[in-house]
Amino acid sequence: MAKKIDAYIKLQVKSGSANPSPPVGPALGQKGVNIMEFCKAFNARTEKMEKGMPIPVVITVYSDRSFTFETKTPPASFLLKTAAGLKSGSPRPNTQKVGTIARAKIQEIAETKAADMTGADIEAMTRSIEGTARSMGLVVED
């Protein structure tokens, strides 16, 4: 018989640096999960990724306090900022542009995120990433 699911916990944790401090510790502690066990497993799974990259993770907590977790791809905004060499997006994206990004780079990001996105095809996902880029104050070039 399958284990009974008690809760789902969604967090964004920096790759390779999960530790018991907030937000990880309090979120897992409330559900009675072994925090250090999660931190060690998460750090082991993300050790080959660029250190400090925010990784969304969905933790499934079972009624016996055991858990499983699934890591996802980094947020599109992080990938766009990295590709454009920015620290942050524009405070006023409609009037103040902060950089440019090539459409080919956006398509590459869409292909990276394809596993997590629910788009119909790669073109739809590319348009979605383009919208994110424009809302950050980036100009999309061909």
UniProtKB/Swiss-Prot annotation:
Keyword tags: Methylation, Ribonucleoprotein, Ribosomal protein, RNA-binding, rRNA-binding
Post-translational modification: One or more lysine residues are methylated.
Protein name (database record): Large ribosomal subunit protein uL11
Subunit composition and interactions: Part of the ribosomal stalk of the 50S ribosomal subunit. Interacts with L10 and the large rRNA to form the base of the stalk. L10 forms an elongated spine to which L12 dimers bind in a sequential fashion forming a multimeric L10(L12)X complex.
Homology family: Belongs to the universal ribosomal protein uL11 family.
The organism's taxonomic lineage, starting at the top: Bacteria, Pseudomonadati, Pseudomonadota, Gammaproteobacteria, Alteromonadales
InterPro entries: Ribosomal_uL11, Ribosomal_uL11_bac-typ, Ribosomal_uL11_C, Ribosomal_uL11_C_sf, Ribosomal_uL11_CS, Ribosomal_uL11_N, Ribosomal_uL11_N_sf
SUPFAM superfamilies for the chain: Ribosomal L11/L12e N-terminal domain, Ribosomal protein L11, C-terminal domain
Pfam families: Ribosomal_L11 (PF00298), Ribosomal_L11_N (PF03946)
GO biological process: translation
Any one annotated GO CC term: cytosolic large ribosomal subunit
GO MF assignments: large ribosomal subunit rRNA binding; structural constituent of ribosome
Function text: Forms part of the ribosomal stalk which helps the ribosome interact with GTP-bound translation factors.
Database matches in NCBIfam families: L11_bact
